[in-house]
Amino acid sequence: MRIFILGRTKYQEAWALMKRIHDEVASGVSEEMILVTEHDHVITVGRHGRLNNVLRRELPIYVVERGGDATYHGPGQAVVYPVVRLRGGVRSYLWALEEAVIRTLDKYGISAGRREDHRGVWVGGKKIASVGIAVERGVAYHGVAVYVNPHMEYFYHINPCGLPPSVITSMRQLGVEADVFEVGYAVAANLETLLQRQERLKTRCESLRRIP
């Protein structure tokens, strides 16, 4: 598994690259990869989302394959797109994505966690990272966005994941200054470690099932 830092990208370019890599991984002609990027201003809406959660239509809008509802991406967000085979179920993979963010934030002195009623990573009642994936042919893509130091006013263009815009926070709002790509790389590295552990556990369980 390799980690690539793409730098700042337009959403449609990263989306096309991610889908191409997905097809190659699913076909067995490419290794798994984790892409780290930061997008120009854009709004995406997941496959089960509602366009009426986009409150203002001034930014480019893309309806995409991932789960979830309306999300804003832009400068100041560390966006991590793993293109990886599922080691277990979707729920265990989503747990690993969230856990990679939680462990990263802990290194910056931020105590974060989960909520049972909403996906993502939370600090108190505020959302600091959004998660949304798609799975096709056993390979996951799309991923997670961590709010490092984004332009907070743009979240008022949407109801983020169907929630009020005021629910969003960032590392900067919590008093932590950090580099977007350093945060993104740390999330990717933590995720790689977690997925390797899931792979070892899966292999061990399969070996036990083969014992007569």
Swiss-Prot record:
Highest rank taxon of the organism: Archaea
An annotated GO BP: protein modification process
Entry keyword set: Acyltransferase, Cytoplasm, Transferase
GO CC terms in record: cytoplasm
Main location group: cytoplasm
Chain positions recorded as substrate binding sites: 66-73, 130-132, 143-145
Gene3D superfamilies reported in the protein's UniProt record: Bira Bifunctional Protein, Domain 2
This enzyme's EC code(s): 2.3.1.181
Record family assignment: Belongs to the LipB family.
Task performed by this protein: Catalyzes the transfer of endogenously produced octanoic acid from octanoyl-acyl-carrier-protein onto the lipoyl domains of lipoate-dependent enzymes. Lipoyl-ACP can also act as a substrate although octanoyl-ACP is likely to be the physiological substrate.
Note: In the reaction, the free carboxyl group of octanoic acid is attached via an amide linkage to the epsilon-amino group of a specific lysine residue of lipoyl domains of lipoate-dependent enzymes.
Protein's recorded name: Probable octanoyltransferase
The organism's taxonomic lineage, starting at the top: Archaea, Thermoproteota, Thermoprotei, Thermoproteales, Thermoproteaceae
Originating gene: lipB
